[in-house]
Regions:
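Terminal low-complexity tails and localization/encapsulation signals of metabolic enzymes
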Residues: 1-52, 86-90, 118
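Glycine-rich loop-to-alpha-helix module at the N-terminal edge of alpha/beta enzyme cores
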Residues: 49-117
Length: 118
């Protein structure tokens, strides 16, 4: 998908939408345990533009357990505040550097793709 509603998508956005969607749990990209997916529908025309894992209770439990382990015994609680700050600032830099792609994805998800999202 390089275009949506006749609007040329940023190459990174198009590549992202073309990839299979998975969930990040415990540092690994995984499918839903049941293997099911759900359509992500463009509200503007009702067309499916990608599919996402249909996480169920077991997937949620797995994610919560992994997050609890990471928070209680992972690297984050052992980090000095200044090191946490550096990571969060790096995240902010990455979000800013990729703002166009995030804006396109949000516009698509809300059915508002067009010149207004640029």
């Amino acid at each position: 998908m390089n275009k949506l509603h006749g609007i040329e998508l940023h190459p990174t956005t198009a590549a992202f939408l073309a990839q299979p969607r998975r969930m990040l749990i415990g540092g690994e990209w995984v499918n839903a345990l049941a293997g099911e997916t759900l359509p992500v529908v463009d509200p503007a025309d009702g067309e499916t533009f990608c599919r996402v894992p249909a996480g169920e209770a077991a997937d949620i439990d797995r994610a919560v357990q992994a997050a609890s382990r990471a928070f209680e015994s992972g690297d984050w609680p052992k980090m000095r505040p200044v090191d946490r700050e550096r990571l969060l600032l790096k995240l902010a830099d990455l979000l800013e550097a990729n703002a166009q792609e995030f804006a396109e994805l949000e516009a698509i998800d809300n059915g508002k793709i067009g010149r207004a999202h640029v």
